[in-house]
């Protein structure tokens, strides 16, 4: 297997400077079509930011787009998705909003990859969404006039049924109906210009697919559609990988891996946290390798780590790790813990995490927090005396009064990285 950095084809007229694939112009290279090289992929991951549900921005879309342009973002994560409420995709407005968002981002910078997500949830409301004929044909079935069938997506042993709440379950990837749904979602997103999809908790949906054969089958269909219809004839696929990433017969199923940051509390410094190889189920140093969907080989697939959101404990602000590893940090999920910190420490911590990854695992990249929901967020006068429900990296201003002001720090980190 190759070492971390692979060679670059001279025919593309590229240079490798400071770990970045550079075009002949001297700018980082973001060109791909039909497949993506490791260096171009890493250029994107190194300029990645989470912008949850940007298509219907909970803040100010104009200011969000301004921020993305200002900082030079190249990979805009989780910009459109469904968490339940599947009937929305049957409403033309949903995809129209998504298409307009993608178009506006590309007017500012056509190189940007905009990511959607297909998560580990289906609800009874999925029965309101018609199955198109082309989805039946993709899976070798005769088209019929019907809607997606919630019951056909569930685990036969009833595990994970009503997992999220009554009528809201984790789908079983081994079921053809589940594959049809995810294929339909992926194709619908590609049709509006989406070029990457995060497939959520892949192992949760694949608890009966330990060899990943069903995931491989789904992704074969998705990649086939991308080769015909996607903006650059390729879809960049990832998922959360607690088992370090799916490999089938030596071939990686995903283009990069993703996982939460898993901050470790500093026991004698309340609210402080660090990163550590080997802590809990953190991905550092253990991302699986193999042959990628684009054909290059690696010992460890590049990956993103993100400030995840998943709830909190009954003791917010108190240690969650005193008795051992926990996914919670000082009683909060990761993005909520981050939001509770003073502005100076938030900025310091972004520098710290960026540099820590460079030192401890150069296969890993920090996905900057741009926009994400909070659980039990900090109180704020701007929230009408209540708690802030959303983290915005935007500089605090009249356009974004609840901005947490990491915008210029993110820009400075990326600018410094470009100069190296």
Specify the residue positions occupied by each region the protein language model found.
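N-terminal processing/targeting junctions
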Residues: 21-23
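Bacterial N-terminal signal peptides that target proteins for export
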Residues: 1-10
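Glycan-processing catalytic domains of CAZymes
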Residues: 25-420
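Bacterial N-terminal signal peptides
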Residues: 10-19
């Amino acid at each position: 297997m190759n070492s971390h950095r692979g060679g670059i084809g001279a025919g593309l007229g590229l240079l490798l400077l400071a770990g970045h694939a550079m075009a002949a112009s001297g700018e980082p290279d973001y060109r791909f079509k039909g497949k993506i090289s490791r260096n171009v992929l890493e250029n994107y991951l190194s300029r990645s930011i989470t912008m949850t549900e940007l298509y219907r921005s909970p803040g100010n879309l104009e200011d969000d787009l301004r921020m993305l342009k200002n900082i030079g973002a190249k990979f805009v994560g989780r910009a459109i998705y469904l968490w339940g409420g599947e009937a929305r995709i049957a409403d033309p407005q949903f995809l129209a909003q998504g298409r307009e968002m993608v178009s506006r981002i590309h007017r500012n910078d056509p190189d940007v990859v905009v990511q959607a997500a297909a998560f580990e949830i289906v609800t009874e409301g999925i029965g309101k969404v018609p199955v198109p004929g082309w989805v039946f044909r993709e899976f070798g079935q005769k088209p019929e006039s019907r809607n997606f069938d919630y019951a056909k997506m569930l685990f036969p042993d009833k595990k994970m049924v009503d997992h999220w709440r009554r009528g809201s379950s984790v789908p079983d990837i081994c079921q053809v109906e589940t594959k049809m749904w995810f294929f339909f979602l992926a194709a619908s997103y590609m049709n509006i210009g989406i070029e990457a999809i995060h497939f959520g908790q892949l192992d949760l949906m694949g608890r009966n697919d330990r060899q990943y054969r069903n995931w491989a089958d789904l992704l074969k269909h998705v990649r086939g559609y991308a080769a015909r219809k996607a903006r650059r004839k390729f879809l960049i696929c990832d998922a959360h990988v607690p088992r370090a990433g799916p490999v089938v017969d030596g071939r990686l199923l995903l283009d990069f891996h993703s996982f939460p940051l898993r901050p470790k509390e500093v026991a004698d410094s309340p609210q402080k946290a660090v990163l550590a190889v080997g802590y809990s189920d953190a991905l550092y140093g253990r991302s699986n390798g193999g042959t990628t969907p684009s054909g290059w080989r690696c010992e460890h697939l590049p990956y993103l780590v993100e400030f995840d959101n998943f709830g909190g404990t009954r003791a917010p602000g108190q240690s969650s790790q005193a008795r051992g590893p926990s996914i919670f940090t000082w009683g909060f999920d990761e993005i909520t813990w981050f939001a509770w910190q003073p502005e100076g420490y938030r900025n310091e911590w972004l520098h710290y995490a960026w540099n820590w990854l460079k030192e401890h695992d150069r296969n890993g990249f920090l996905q900057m927090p741009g926009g994400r929901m909070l659980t039990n967020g900090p109180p704020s006068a701007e929230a009408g005396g209540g708690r802030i429900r959303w983290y915005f990296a935007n500089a605090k201003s009249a356009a974004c009064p609840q901005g947490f002001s990491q915008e210029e720090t993110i820009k400075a980190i990326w600018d410094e990285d470009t100069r190296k």
